[in-house]
Amino acid sequence: MQLSLTQPCFSGTLLMLAVSTLLLWEQVTSAPNYRMSTGSLYQRVVELSHYTHDLASKVFIEFDMKFGRTVWTHNLMLSPCHTAAIPTPENSEQVHQAKSEDLLKVSITILQAWQEPLKHIVAAVATLPDGSDTLLSRTKELEERIQGLLEGLETILSRVQPGAVGSDYTFWSEWSDLQSSDKSTKNGVLSVLYRCMRRDTHKVDNFLKVLKCRDIYNNNC
């Protein structure tokens, strides 16, 4: 099919966006993290963190617009996130008072807590009768981005505090609900998970911005 000269060139814009995203991903994952300076690694994980949170927000909005009417919104808003038990700074003052290694550890713990759920989320979205290819591809991408971000943070922590590791947090009990044949139950769990993922990626993004400003620019930013 031949395109007319007046047809909007959306394909070019989408291609540029895709290339930009791919380059950002390759910057964080192509070369071993130990070869980068800590400053460069901070810069790249902050960029990846911001992108990951933006992606999580888009996925949540897309899911809510398509499936929001099939879930009980009031009850879901009261449902706690599975990461709620992870102790984190509650406000800006506590974030700035926290030690760098502690902010890194809690960020790692939050991301680790999403590794297992994301595997089940991807499988559940793949079987949604009314799901879209975009929702599935974005969810898969979230899984990859969070893994890349986790690896970058673990490298930074190993430099800030050699031998330190984040707390192991793997408790998650709702995977069986994602396999439910009841549409409302399944969509309800997905809605909570996408909402919580948006919340947690935003929290990690804020922590990393503080760390970058403090540890790389001595708070002159």
UniProtKB/Swiss-Prot annotation:
It is found in: Secreted. Disulfide bonds join 81-196, 213-221. The keyword 4Fe-4S does not apply. It comes from the Eukaryota. Its main location: secreted. Keywords: Disulfide bond, Hormone, Secreted, Signal. GO terms for biological process: cell surface receptor signaling pathway; female pregnancy; mammary gland development; positive regulation of lactation; positive regulation of receptor signaling pathway via JAK-STAT; response to nutrient levels. Residues 1-30 form the signal peptide. GO terms for molecular function: hormone activity; prolactin receptor binding. InterPro entries: 4_helix_cytokine-like_core, Somatotropin/Prolactin, Somatotropin_CS. Transmembrane segments: none annotated. GO terms for cellular component: extracellular region; extracellular space. Belongs to the somatotropin/prolactin family. This is Prolactin-3B1. It comes from Rattus norvegicus (Rat). The gene is Prl3b1.
